[in-house]
Amino acid sequence: MMSGAFIVFEGADGAGKSTVCKRVFDALTSKGIEAVVTAEPTHTKVGAFIRSGAAGGISQRTEALLFVADRNDHTEWIDEEVSRGKIVLCDRYFASTVAYQSARLDGDSTDRDWLIRINEQFIGKPDATILVDIDPRVGMSRVGTRGEEISKFEKLDFQDQVRSNYLDLAKSY
């Protein structure tokens, strides 16, 4: 049996993470390699709560902790799949929480360090993390062409900060 692996695709909204993830999945499975695709927030109870928007009105730190709780459950599932020899392809993981939540917390380095510390307790280390980088203006235009509603995470100045956070994280890890 082939040994499994955990590969993460990170990047701002509209960067193409989901597309790249799907293409890698298709390439692997066409060669008979067992692979699964997952994403964060997940579809667990905590992930569904985050996705529903019902968490609106809570503090930014509490929201960040919800993402950590979702990731804790997700990591257990990922570890099981990898131990079964599967390649797990994940659309967003740890870096997304740090990039987005630290932007919401005004990019303060103390908040960024706190986000890293609370996440490191619960995350599995990916075998590879691929940052799909894009100019936020291009990403925003892609999001707009999907016909989706622009969320609080998709304003241009916010996406500029998110991209900066991702690039800083890429230098650190």
Task: Please give the residue ranges for each predicted region.
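A glycine- and Lys/Arg-enriched "phosphate-lid" helix/loop adjacent to the NTP-binding pocket
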Residues: 97-164
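Conserved lysine of the Walker
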Residues: 17
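Extreme N-terminal, non-catalytic leader segments
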Residues: 1-6, 34
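Short glycine-/polar-rich loops that comprise or flank the Walker A/P-loop
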Residues: 33, 124-128, 172-173
